[in-house]
């Protein structure tokens, strides 16, 4: 059996490509659109759909320039680039004119940076979420999907707490929208292989620079992992599934950080440096307290508002099953683990992408 076979077996029902939304002829806006997710999202949407417009909204002029070079108008005539910050409510509202779908990916997401700059973290992750909701409601956007993180479940750091607050804002926004207004949902997933600032390129850079060792915070530490392609497909399929008020959680494998380091640089020794402030030993995506509101949808879980029995009935009719009382979906209890062969294959696919 080849490495590709191992990975195919592991993700056999986890491509997250079904169902798909109808984005042909639609206007789509991505906040934080110049990041790793945004660029993969553009490629995915361009390959599958013929959108009327795809608006990239971000605050970094250089990244916007680089992305315009990577996506030239001759090949991507539907692309539009807006300089703006989610902290700027007026600019957001201007950018959302005639927009059908918003994918909210803008965030300050690095744990130590958020801890050291708490006011900035709150302004972007919490006030920014409020501004996105307000602009979407005022502009009559059809659907908004907000990207979250496993760190928002039982948070122990400011980044996680700010994303939990953001999640609550988006879920509660449905109450302001009314029955025929904007539909809001949240997607919550783990670490993205190869994304900017993640541990994979960090380990790769150390190995390439001739480091004598790789720093490991704790040899027991585990994390959920997902590829960029899977992340984009999960967002798109959740957009198609959503009726408003859900938190969608993908079923994805876990791995130990020490195994990841060993696959990237098997020749380098590892040095335990201790868990940093705000870090968890293991991550959780469905806490026990949310189990009673959670349904199993085969390739994902959906956490529902406790006050919406009609929404629960809708997903049960689609084959959703309640999870057991006391259920917890955490990286250390996850039954799906990446072994060395599958991990190497996963890294190879990520690097090729």
Residue ranges and their predicted role:
Residues 1-25, 138, 172-353:
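Strand-loop microenvironment adjacent to phosphate/nucleotide-handling motifs in alpha/beta enzyme folds
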Residues 26-47:
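N-terminal Rossmann NAD(P)H-binding glycine-rich loop of SDR-like oxidoreductase domains
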Residues 80-101:
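Conserved Rossmann-fold cofactor-binding substructure of NAD(P)-dependent oxidoreductases
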Residues 44-53, 140:
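Conserved S-adenosyl-L-methionine
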Residues 58, 82-83, 123, 272:
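Conserved residues in the N-terminal Rossmann fold of short-chain dehydrogenase/reductase
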Residues 49-63:
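Conserved glycine-rich Rossmann-like NAD(P)H-binding loop of the short-chain dehydrogenase/reductase
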Residues 101-104, 108-112, 116-164, 168, ...:
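Conserved Rossmann-fold NAD(P)-dependent oxidoreductase catalytic core, especially the SDR/UDP-sugar
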Residues 81, 121, 184-187:
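Hydrophobic/aromatic anchor residues within beta-strands of the central parallel beta-sheet
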């Amino acid at each position: 059996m080849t490495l590709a076979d191992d990975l195919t077996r592991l993700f056999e029902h986890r491509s997250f490509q079904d169902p798909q939304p109808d984005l042909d002829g639609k206007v789509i806006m991505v906040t934080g659109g110049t990041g790793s997710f945004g660029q993969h999202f553009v490629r995915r949407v361009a390959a599958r759909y013929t959108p009327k417009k795809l608006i990239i909204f971000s605050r970094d002029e250089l990244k916007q320039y680089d992305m315009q070079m990577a996506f030239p108008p001759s090949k991507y005539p539907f692309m539009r680039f807006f300089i703006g910050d989610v902290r700027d409510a007026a600019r957001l509202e201007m950018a959302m004119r005639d927009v059908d779908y918003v994918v909210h990916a803008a965030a300050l997401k690095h744990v130590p940076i958020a801890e050291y700059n708490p006011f900035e973290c709150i302004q972007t992750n919490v006030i920014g979420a409020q501004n996105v909701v307000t602009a979407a409601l005022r502009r009559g956007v059809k659907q908004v999907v907000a990207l979250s993180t496993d760190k928002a479940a039982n948070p122990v750091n400011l980044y996680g707490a700010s994303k939990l607050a953001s999640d609550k804002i988006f879920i509660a926004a449905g109450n302001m929208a009314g029955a025929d207004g904007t539909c809001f949902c949240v997607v919550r997933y783990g670490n993205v292989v190869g994304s900017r600032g993640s541990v994979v390129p960090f380990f790769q850079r150390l190995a390439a620079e001739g480091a004598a060792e790789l720093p490991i915070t704790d040899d027991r530490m585990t994390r959920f992992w997902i590829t960029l392609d899977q992340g984009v497909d999960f967002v798109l399929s959740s957009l198609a599934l959503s009726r408003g008020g859900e938190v969608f959680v993908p079923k994805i494998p876990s791995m130990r950080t020490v195994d990841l380091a060993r696959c990237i640089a098997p020749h380098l020794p590892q040095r335990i440096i201790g868990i940093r402030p705000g870090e968890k030993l293991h991550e959780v995506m469905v806490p026990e307290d949310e189990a009673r509101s959670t349904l199993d949808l085969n390739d994902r879980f959906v956490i529902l508002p406790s006050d919406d029995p009609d929404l629960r009935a809708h997903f049960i009719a689609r084959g959703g099953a309640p999870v057991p009382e006391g259920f917890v979906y955490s990286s250390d209890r996850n039954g799906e683990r990446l072994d060395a062969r599958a991990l190497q294959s996963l890294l190879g696919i990520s690097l090729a992408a």
